[in-house]
A protein has these predicted regions:
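N-terminal cap/lid segment of alpha/beta-hydrolase-fold proteins
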Residues: 1-2
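Conserved HGGG/HGGXW glycine-rich cap/lid loop of the alpha/beta-hydrolase fold
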Residues: 6-53
Length: 75
């Protein structure tokens, strides 16, 4: 699944993921603090924010989504 994400900054990669009922907008303060020294990727998990909806909502599927995103970004 192609997740919605934002990417800012440069340096070591930090992938930020929100908790239940959240979205990447919840990660703004943390992202702002990390951006001066890191490449920050903030992610909307499946069924959250602007990412696609799916009937499947479990940890293995969400983990695979993150692996796919990392592959797409050559991380």
């Amino acid at each position: 699944m192609k997740l919605n994400f934002t990417e800012k900054g440069s340096g070591p990669v930090a992938i930020l993921m929100h908790g239940m009922f959240g979205s990447l907008s919840n990660l703004g303060n943390l992202a702002r603090h990390l951006t001066p020294t890191h490449r920050v990727i903030s992610v909307d998990l499946r069924n959250h924010g602007d990412s696609p909806q799916s009937a499947t909502m479990d940890i293995p599927a969400m983990a695979e989504d993150i692996v796919q995103l990392m592959d797409d970004l050559s991380l």
